[in-house]
């Protein structure tokens, strides 16, 4: 497989991985204040994602794949809010272990990586097009 096609495959795998990462971050942000459905029940638990390199046999290129989707087992945040329906008998409410600042940083990083992969695809496509034009002109 030629290097330009390999670059397209690598970038496409990066796009898929970052798209999944953005979805996970979005779910975490959307549920950052979700409490349990009963007093004392556990709230939403932050989701995590990890990536791994996979070698494409046809091209020998290292592709990115989602290795694992998991949950963050860190402690929940606890807040005193006796009026909350999810509050226990002491008025304490368990809140998700989601830190909005971390999620926003993850989102920006994933967005930049997504844009970089898009740019690589565009440049590879342009190079392929220019190569075809040169081959046509030489005939």
UniProtKB/Swiss-Prot annotation:
Keywords: Bacterial flagellum. The keyword RNA-binding does not apply. One of its GO terms (cellular component) is bacterial-type flagellum basal body, rod. This is Flagellar basal-body rod protein FlgC. The keyword Zinc-finger does not apply. It is found in: Bacterial flagellum basal body. Belongs to the flagella basal body rod proteins family. The basal body constitutes a major portion of the flagellar organelle and consists of four rings (L,P,S, and M) mounted on a central rod. The rod consists of about 26 subunits of FlgG in the distal portion, and FlgB, FlgC and FlgF are thought to build up the proximal portion of the rod with about 6 subunits each. PANTHER family: FLAGELLAR BASAL-BODY ROD PROTEIN FLGC (PTHR30435:SF2), FLAGELLAR PROTEIN (PTHR30435). InterPro entries: Flag_bb_rod_N, Flagellar_basal_body_rod_CS, Flg_bb/hook_C_dom, FlgC. Transmembrane segments: none annotated. Pfam families: Flg_bb_rod, Flg_bbr_C. GO terms for biological process: bacterial-type flagellum-dependent swarming motility. It comes from Rhizobium meliloti (strain 1021).
